[in-house]
Amino acid sequence: MREQSSYKDAGVDIDKANLFISRIIPLIKMTSRKEVMKGIGGFGGLFHLDLKKIKDPVLVAATDGVGTKIKIAQMMNKHDTVGIDLVAMSVNDIIVQGAEPIFFLDYIAIGQMDVERNVKLIEGIVKGCQEAGCALIGGETAEMPGIYSENEYDLAGFCIGVVENGRIIDGSDIRVGDRVIGIASNGIHSNGYSLVRKVIFDKAKLNVDDTIEGIENSIGEELLRPTRIYVKPVLNLMKSFNIKGIVHITGGGFVDNIPRIVPNQCCTVIRMNSWQIPPIFSIIQELGDIDQMEMVRVFNMGIGMILIVSEKETDDIVERLNMLGEKAYIIGSIEKADGEKSAVSFT
């Protein structure tokens, strides 16, 4: 008699997948908005855009992942925060356009179904969606033995936001004399981890459980600090102030991200002594013998989001941000570009 084959024998356990879905449905409901028309389980998520609130809507889409920060989560066997990172990376990209994130979808690629671990991943995604005020309306968990090893996984997120046409923030109103406000990050966030891992684990031979002078947590805990979500404070600001430009400091740091929003006839001057750079960055720089320009091109250096505003509104905006629980600093200004200056310069 020939031996029968099954999907489970091939490494894909449908029963475990169904158990996972049953576990996460109550979590996902915690992110629901009134515009969500149907619960999880359909072939696609349904979201009814309310045209009474917004008359000429423009949809804004963003997608991102968490990068090799996932390796730290796997080393720590701590999986409840990288979901926050996943949401943050996309919703922060949405808000810089002046758009409100309204719904989110996730994609989890795994080698083998680990229900408890995957529930932790969704718990983080749910928390991130709650912080951003957007609904988790769908997702995909792809079990792919042979592509990923048993304990490996990867994450991708997709977010849609909406903004009134005519209120899109695109940097076109930025002028010489405008001020640059930096909002504090929560550590490294989700970029630069390939360099971080090379320096800390390969070069310095440290472990996730080790401690370093100047940092209260273990190395692993410090590196897993979740990316800060700036949606609610920025939405609050947009109701009262003219925010001319917003920059999410992600891959490319200050050097590559600021020019994406500042007009070519302007340059941005950043004063590096205007805020306290968290110790983790100086530790990485020292252990890795990393050049300062490389640091500001790879890492956020303690500033997760930048606002460009008129001089007259600067102090009031900083005061509002502090009132909202954000640490905000005036970190620079917009100057006239010339042939000798870089698009972003540091003093």
Curated annotation (Swiss-Prot):
It holds the Pfam family AIRS_C. One of its GO terms (cellular component) is cytosol. This is Phosphoribosylformylglycinamidine cyclo-ligase. The keyword Manganese does not apply. InterPro entries: PurM-like_C_dom, PurM-like_C_sf, PurM-like_N, PurM-like_N_sf, PurM_cligase. GO terms for biological process: 'de novo' IMP biosynthetic process; adenine biosynthetic process. One of its GO terms (molecular function) is ATP binding. It catalyses: 2-formamido-N(1)-(5-O-phospho-beta-D-ribosyl)acetamidine + ATP = 5-amino-1-(5-phospho-beta-D-ribosyl)imidazole + ADP + phosphate + H(+). Belongs to the AIR synthase family. Its EC number is 6.3.3.1. Keywords: ATP-binding, Cytoplasm, Ligase, Nucleotide-binding, Purine biosynthesis. It is found in: Cytoplasm. Pathway: Purine metabolism; IMP biosynthesis via de novo pathway; 5-amino-1-(5-phospho-D-ribosyl)imidazole from N(2)-formyl-N(1)-(5-phospho-D-ribosyl)glycinamide: step 2/2. The keyword Nucleotide-binding applies. Gene3D superfamilies: PurM-like C-terminal domain (3.90.650.10), PurM-like, N-terminal domain (3.30.1330.10).
